[in-house]
């Protein structure tokens, strides 16, 4: 199968306000979004953290829609840049690249395989890992990326992996250091997505 049959990629300019990106296609299956900031337009550092324009950032997503294949209504999603607690919440415009890809297991024309999964994180505590199995095993340990797909919790959040194998992996979320140091603090349940792929994809 050709990659373009179940996925598309692009770029856009976004900031710390929500932006809606409309895709070029509609999809029969639910889609996952993977996005990264590919520019660095932060301002001058300051010793006053609240005024510091140089800050860590994370992409937040919401309202991911696969579109409607019957009406040819394309898919879409909302995206913004988020800064951690204690920094100014306003971030300047940055270039972001994204991949929209349909859920499922896909065999490409070159023989490589990839799998896209969408699931809810069941643990709400910081740094508490949960196991996630692939739908079918890979022949070797695959490459793996994942991203939070919702913004049910408004605190800054990022994901960590460990014990990646041919059959699955473990994943945990981390909030910023202010929230994360409170080991008992909980984050609302979010929808997560992963993309696992053969070496050489």
Language-model-detected regions and their locations in the chain:
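Extracellular receptor-binding modules and their adjoining Ser/Thr/Gly/Asp/Asn-rich linkers
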Residues: 1-201
